Amino acid sequence: MGCGKLFRVKQRLTRSETPPGIIGTVIRRNRNKNYTEERKMKKDLTELVFVLDRSGSMEHLTGDTIGGFNAVLKEHRNGEGEVLVTTYLFNDTASMIHDRLPAAEVKPMTEKDYCACGCTALMDALGTAIRHIAGIHRYAREEDIPEHTIFVITTDGMENASHSFSAEEVRKMVKHEQEKYGWEFLFLASNIDAVENAEHIGIRRENAVDCCPDAAGTEMLYNAASRAIGNIRGRKNLAGDTSWRNEADRDFHNRGK
């Protein structure tokens, strides 16, 4: 870290029922399943949201982080379907450098975009990103809502600087989107227990991956993320599939401490 039943009609949620920042409607969801029911979404459209740590302790991995991010985008820029990219970089604060840009229009990240410094306000960054994307989906026509929504979260340390969102608030938001809307969250971390920290904010343990805090570990991390994104775009969810993370798991088992 840095410093120190199937709904046939729309159902309005009350503030007490809705996680912070997600006051809207639920449309045709099955409460007994943890993925989105078949509906008139925009097929082959993926909402891809990056929430990337750029706190001070990430400085030695600046080039590797930039390279990993650019490699993921290069792989998913072409092929079937469309990808909309949103990117938040966070330290003490969260900065959005891409706002739902078609992947083909996203320029490669450089050190001008990614400058590591400061503390780790992960809750604020993730809460802000979820609220932004959920708000857009809430007011979109049903047929314009992306078929898949994927969050890729990276960090190398413990939360230590958030003021706007608590871990409990973020947990409610994450679980709401996972269970009601079929969103996928990937939590990729070094220097902390990825599973413990992911579960603390509602992310499923099988979507949490540990990596070594070096160039090879960072490459494994982004390779895993790219495979997961490809699997989600191809088969709709990651339930029961851990193949995307096997290489990263082996590396951490062999070299991690």
Stretches with model-predicted labels:
Residues 6, 11-12:
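Cationic, low-complexity basic patches in intrinsically disordered or flexible, solvent-exposed regions
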